[in-house]
């Protein structure tokens, strides 16, 4: 896959790569925390607000469905306004959302309405962080930076998992949302202080929109299965007889593994000259085995399945976003928003399908279907890679013709 040579600025006056990456992690974690906290608290929420696994799947699905609708327009806004302002808007919005959930979620309908009203916060937080990294981090550190940034997703599930035994089972789920709101406000201190200058503009034909759309579709399938993992793991473990506190710790274990592997993916990406999308496809194929193990009875299978599913089946987003940004340095937020449409669409459909399967056929059947879907996403990712390679060849040949004229 062809990559751009100057995706980030190397201005010596710019903040350090470490500080930029840390800020991106904090902003992304705060932005995505509301939905994953809802999944981790699902046992307590369902008891108080009277809904079943399909109801949980519906609320999460609608959340990501609204996110999919917001992705492209929010991407345009982030490109025009800059990450300094939009990152602050995102974390304040997430804080307001969690405070509203703590105080106003008195019924299932109220839970749904509140989450949908705040879905745009996740989109803006993700895209503003992508823009910050693309314009502030040197090219030779960008892979690791995106790996660190995407570690925010398992970091959010880590916080959500810890909230179950530490808060939800002691003082209640409303306090867990309240603490989440305070943490989101604290994220304001990590937001970027300035907007880095954009890279030089390239022609619109350089964006490889068709290839990005195919990769977005593959990402949608993978994201649908991965979203179900973060949302339904605790409920699934409790259903097989695991103590709720231990089930929350299983989510924590998976989050730590996923966080570590995402950073490893990024570090290794900086040492390669290409092949990033192929690595994503291989990770998805291997992660399918972890989902199959989640369908197998017994605690050992659960532990190994959690490690594989989080470590391989859900460790690819940072590497994929890195590849997309390298290909589209002049409009990183807009380019990643194309892929994010697929990701959010998968987040919309995945929980609905999984929740329905879990309700009518049981969790083992739902995890098995997830494994098959992840294999299909790996194959589609390879198709998108072939399209990217073909686009890169056409662009190279066009450049040669222009230089020879």
Regions found by a protein language model. Give the residues of each.
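Conserved MFS/SLC helix-loop-helix module at the cytosolic interface between two early adjacent transmembrane helices
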Residues: 69-105
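Helix-loop-helix hairpin linking two adjacent transmembrane segments in secondary transporters
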Residues: 110, 148-192
């Amino acid at each position: 896959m062809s990559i751009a040579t100057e995706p980030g600025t190397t201005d010596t006056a710019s903040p350090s790569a470490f500080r930029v990456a840390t800020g991106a992690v904090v902003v992304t974690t705060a932005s995505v925390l509301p939905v994953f906290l809802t999944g981790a608290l699902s046992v307590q929420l369902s008891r108080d607000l009277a809904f079943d696994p399909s109801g949980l799947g519906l609320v999460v699905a609608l959340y990501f469905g609204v996110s999919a609708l917001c992705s492209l327009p929010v991407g345009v806004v982030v490109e025009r306004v800059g990450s300094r302002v939009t990152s602050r808007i995102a974390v304040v919005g997430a804080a307001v959302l969690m405070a509203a959930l703590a105080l106003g979620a008195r019924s299932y309908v109220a839970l749904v309405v509140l989450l949908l009203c705040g879905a745009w916060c996740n989109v803006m937080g993700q895209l503003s962080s992508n823009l910050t990294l693309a314009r502030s981090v040197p090219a030779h550190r960008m892979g690791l930076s995106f790996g660190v940034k995407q570690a925010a997703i398992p970091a959010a599930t880590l916080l959500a998992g810890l909230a179950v035994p530490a808060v939800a089972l002691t003082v209640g789920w409303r306090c867990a949302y309240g603490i989440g709101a305070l943490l989101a406000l604290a994220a304001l201190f990590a937001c970027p202080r300035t907007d880095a200058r954009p890279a030089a503009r390239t022609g619109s034909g350089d964006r490889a929109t068709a290839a990005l759309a195919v990769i977005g579709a593959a990402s949608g399938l993978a994201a649908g299965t991965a979203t179900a993992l973060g949302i339904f793991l605790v409920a699934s473990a409790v259903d097989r007889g695991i103590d709720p506190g231990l089930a929350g710790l299983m989510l924590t274990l998976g989050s730590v593994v996923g966080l570590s592997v995402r950073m490893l993916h990024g570090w290794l990406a900086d040492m390669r000259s290409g092949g990033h999308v192929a690595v994503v496809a291989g990770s998805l194929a291997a992660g399918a085995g972890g989902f199959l193990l989640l369908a197998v009875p017994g605690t050992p299978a659960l532990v190994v399945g959690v490690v594989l599913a989080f470590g391989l089946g859900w460790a690819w987003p940072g590497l994929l976003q890195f590849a997309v940004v390298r290909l589209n340095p002049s409009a990183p937020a807009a380019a990643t928003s194309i892929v994010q449409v697929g990701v959010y669409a998968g987040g919309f459909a995945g929980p609905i399908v999984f929740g329905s399967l879990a309700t009518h056929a049981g969790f083992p059947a739902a995890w098995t279907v997830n494994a098959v879907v992840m294999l299909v996403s790996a194959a589609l990712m390879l198709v998108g890679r072939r399209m990217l390679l073909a686009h890169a060849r056409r662009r190279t040949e066009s450049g040669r013709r222009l230089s020879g004229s």
